[in-house]
């Protein structure tokens, strides 16, 4: 989200990173709050997709995070009669998926006629929440490899020089030092904090071990019958909001009759598996409300895709 706050509380360059609350300790994620120019504040919430409780809603967790006193402070009036009243104004909203598994999860970055660079490939320094420099560097390395290929009269082949150059670059060294950061969180927030601190500040990223993931994120999900529903507070329309009003200010546009780009191979799976076993988690994990379970005329359920 993008907000405009009271100039008296604005500190250009101020950075806040948080971990833990409101999520459980076994759920990977965290939040950021950056003070930019013109009394603007950019804030966001990251939720790892390896969470176990299907009732969790990344969007609702973000809204709840803003109610923490240390965060709410920047949006409310803390003086006079109207003390505690929200005086800041929300200007924008957005959401995206982040490839944040680190260097150990990089895919094959080259294919005939093309290459993957930047955050889409996973070149993200997870511990520092930095990716722009990696996107620029990998773009440069891929461009140099493409230039050499064109100079040699080659076309539509595989740019093997690009991944080779990456492995010799300072970026590889930087990301390699960060390789265990996310994987430590499978042991919980406390152990992850201790071990990441040890690796990054004591060993300076020169650890002789590498943590490997043994199963994909979705495999950590538990059936709804084994989990407790999460009671999220209703939005107040001042500090916390619902999905519909948020999407409205996201500047997302499409043609009125544009065909949906999301399709189902088997329409029975969302109902017979996801709704029956996991309480319809897709109705919660999408921060734009794209997936919605509705009733048919015969009172049976179906997944409606609002795209």
Q: For each predicted feature, which ranges?
A:
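Central beta-strand plus flanking loop segment that forms part of the substrate or channel wall
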Residues: 1-12
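Aromatic-residue-lined binding/catalytic grooves and analogous aromatic/hydrophobic interfacial grooves
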Residues: 17, 21-25, 35-36, 217-228
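Conserved FAD/dinucleotide-binding core of flavoprotein oxidoreductases
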Residues: 23-92, 159-163, 191, 202
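Short FAD-binding loop at a beta-strand-to-alpha-helix junction that anchors the flavin cofactor
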Residues: 37-39, 108-127, 284-292
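Glycine- and acidic
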Residues: 45-46, 120-130, 267-270, 293, ...
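Acidic, polar low-complexity linker/tail segments
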Residues: 93-108
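Active-site-proximal substrate-binding core of FAD-dependent oxidoreductases
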Residues: 122-128, 134, 140, 144-191, ...
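Ferredoxin-type iron-sulfur electron-transfer modules and their immediate structural context
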Residues: 169-304
């Amino acid at each position: 989200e993008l907000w405009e706050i009271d100039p008296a509380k604005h500190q250009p360059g101020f950075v806040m990173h948080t971990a833990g609350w409101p999520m459980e300790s076994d759920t990977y994620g965290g939040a950021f709050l950056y003070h930019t120019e013109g009394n603007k504040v950019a804030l966001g919430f990251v939720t790892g997709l390896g969470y176990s409780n299907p009732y969790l809603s990344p969007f609702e967790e973000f809204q709840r995070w803003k109610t923490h006193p240390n965060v709410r402070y920047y949006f409310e009036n803390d003086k006079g009669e109207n003390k505690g009243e929200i005086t800041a104004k929300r200007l924008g909203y957005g959401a995206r998926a982040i490839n944040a598994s680190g260097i150990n999860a990089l895919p094959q970055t080259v294919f005939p006629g093309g290459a993957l660079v930047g955050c889409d490939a996973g070149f993200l320094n997870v511990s520092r929440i930095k990716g722009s420099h990696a996107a620029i560097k990998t773009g440069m390395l891929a461009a140099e490899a493409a230039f050499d290929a064109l100079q040699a009269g080659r076309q539509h082949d595989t740019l093997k020089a690009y991944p080779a150059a990456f492995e010799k670059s300072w970026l590889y060294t930087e990301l390699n030092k960060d390789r265990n950061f996310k994987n430590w969180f499978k042991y919980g927030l406390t152990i992850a904090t201790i071990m990441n601190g040890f690796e990054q500040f004591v060993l300076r990223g020169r650890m002789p071990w590498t943590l490997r993931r043994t199963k994909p994120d979705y495999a950590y999900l538990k059936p709804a019958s084994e989990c407790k529903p999460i009671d999220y507070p209703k939005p107040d329309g001042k500090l916390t909001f619902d999905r519909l009003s948020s999407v409205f200010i996201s500047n997302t546009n499409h043609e009125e009759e544009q065909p949906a780009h999301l399709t189902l191979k088997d329409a029975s799976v969302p109902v017979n598996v996801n709704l029956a076993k996991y309480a319809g988690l897709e109705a919660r994990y999408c921060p734009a409300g794209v997936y919605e379970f509705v009733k048919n005329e015969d009172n049976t359920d179906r997944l409606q895709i609002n795209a």
